[in-house]
Design a protein with these regions (language model features):
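Loop-to-transmembrane-helix transition segments
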Residues: 2-9, 39, 49-80, 162-173, ...
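Juxtamembrane helix-loop-helix junctions in multi-pass membrane proteins
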Residues: 15-42, 57, 174-204
Length: 302
């Protein structure tokens, strides 16, 4: 079953990328990112309720507070990522956002973890860093006429913008810090309890966003626009569920991890098929470096 859970995680998380992009890309809705937080908060809250009341997962105020710094880092990173989806192609955003594993390796080095990393992991980290920096250079130097020409068939047009690259990078930094902190906090907490604490904190964030967006700012919730957000939220939560079960099969973790870590490849594919995004060969070359590094890190993470 590990293989099918791995595929489900890959499909769901790449689907979350796609639906989140569709739900957050409208520039005329300045609260779309907060509405996405509302959607994810609701779905995660429902899943937390299932885990607590049906599966009997232990949760209390102490656990929630202990895990709170990690939860806030993850939630902040996702919110920043949702904002960034307005300004840049998913084909570029997803590989950058999913490069956080390389930054975790860098953090491990900075805190004295050099002995725990093998040369292949260092090489993979270098590949990811070169690829992300290369994507930034390609984006910055691309001729405006060539950009307009390749975006001709796309559903949206994106102007050259420093913000477009900065936001996915901020997501990557915050997610890496969250993952690094996660590894420390989970030494004292049960993983299921920590996940419930995260989901309940996300639910609270969603409620706060609802109060601000709907009750204070009086922004309307249009079903046609909100639908993709909730589809993305379901995919995000289902992907997390499948991920846990895929890695629970300890005999096949070394095979499951790289399959799941390559979900940004599927995100690039979906963006090409459904969003009609088209990049230059230089973009794809840099993305290939990032993906190769992510997959190698996934193998050794197992």
């Amino acid at each position: 079953m590990w293989f099918w859970f791995s595929l489900i995680a890959l499909i769901c998380w790449s689907g979350s990328d796609l639906f989140s992009k569709i739900g957050c890309q409208d520039a005329d809705d300045k609260y779309s990112h907060l509405k996405m937080v509302m959607a994810v908060g609701l779905v995660m809250g429902l899943h937390a309720a299932y885990e607590i009341f049906i599966n009997g997962t232990e949760i209390n105020g102490s656990i929630i507070l202990t895990y709170l710094p990690v939860s806030l880092l993850y939630i902040s990173s996702m919110t920043i990522g949702y904002i960034g989806l307005r300004y840049i192609e998913l084909s570029i955003s997803s590989p950058i956002c999913n490069s956080s594993g390389a930054l975790v390796a860098v953090l491990a080095l900075a805190t004295g973890g050099l002995g725990e990393l093998v040369p292949a992991q260092l090489a993979a980290t270098a590949l990811v860093c070169v690829g992300v920096i290369g994507l930034g250079i390609v984006e910055a130097r691309e001729d405006n006429d060539l950009r307009a020409a390749r975006q001709q068939a796309s559903n949206h047009r994106y102007a050259k913008s420093a913000l477009a690259l900065i936001l996915p990078v901020i997501y990557c930094l915050l997610d890496a810090l969250g993952t690094f902190a996660d590894s420390r906090v989970l030494e004292a907490l049960n993983e299921d309890s920590a996940n419930c604490a995260y989901e309940l904190t996300f639910l609270l964030a969603g409620i706060v966003c609802f109060v601000y967006v709907v009750l204070i700012k009086k922004s309307r919730l249009v079903p046609k626009r909100e639908g993709p957000k909730y589809a993305g939220a379901v995919c995000e939560t289902a992907g997390q569920f499948a991920y846990i079960y895929a890695l629970a099969d300890t005999e096949h973790v070394a095979l499951a991890a790289p399959i799941i870590s390559a979900y940004c490849v599927a995100s690039v594919l979906w963006s090409r098929i459904f969003l009609k995004e088209k990049l230059s060969w230089k973009h794809y070359a840099m993305i290939a470096l990032v993906v190769a590094g992510i997959v190698i890190l996934g193998v050794y993470d197992a």
